[in-house]
Amino acid sequence: MESKITLKTTVYNTVFEDLIEGRYKPNEILTEGALVERFGVSKAPVREALIELCKDGILRSLPRLGYQIVPVTLQEMIDLLDFRVDLELSNLRRAAGRITESDIRCLRELQLNLGHDYSEEVIPHWSLNMQFHMALCQLSGNAYTSKVLYAALHQSSRFVSQYFKAAWSKARESEGRYHMAIVDALAAGDIATAEQMLRKDILAVKEEIQLSLK
């Protein structure tokens, strides 16, 4: 059973990462047989991974054809980013008074790591960005909020794969600037400014993508 779970997870993660990196295109059809051959495993873990990807809204099952990559619409992206603004800002307000010097050092280190990432590959950069936002979220001590945000960031990976390349250079520059400003404001005990910078950070991606599509 342990091996089966591991194989399912491996297939799921690899397909998802390939999607994020743009190796699969929106609406492309994946087949169980091709994935079985690619991974050299039995049908069971591949089928389980595909079912899980369908549950997460990443694929849709097309009887007798295979599994189609579900494209992310611009409106879905906007809705998700707006949700993150509401969730992350309210959570940051809740964290006021709980933030320690150790927390600031941790955030500073994460911010510096992101600032030194010059790769245009989606996964390494997005992973660092997720780490920063998750660390920020965990300051409130609310485990449920952290779980919900992680799910939102995971879903965000899908639109990042479609729109990341077009907006990468400008979004990356503003992202590093805003992250630094958030940490500086928290270190100074200025929650209001930290909230303002966090809002700008989240919405900067939306603005750059909308500009790139005009």
Where are these regions (language model features)?
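A short, ordered amphipathic alpha-helix with a cationic face
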Residues: 54-55, 79-80, 121-124, 168-172
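Short alpha-helical transmembrane interface motifs in multi-pass membrane proteins
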Residues: 73-74, 162-165
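Short arginine-rich
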Residues: 203-213
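Juxtamembrane/interface motifs at transmembrane-helix termini
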Residues: 47-48, 98-101, 125-128, 166-170, ...
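Conserved amphipathic alpha-helical segments that form helical-bundle/coiled-coil interaction surfaces
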Residues: 98-162, 175-181, 185-188, 193-204
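Short helix-capping and inter-helix turn/linker motifs at the boundaries of alpha-helical repeat units
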Residues: 6, 105, 170-174
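Non-membrane alpha-helical structural segments and their capping/turn regions in soluble enzymes
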Residues: 9, 78, 85, 123-126, ...
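Short linear motifs at protein or domain termini
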Residues: 1-97, 138, 211-214
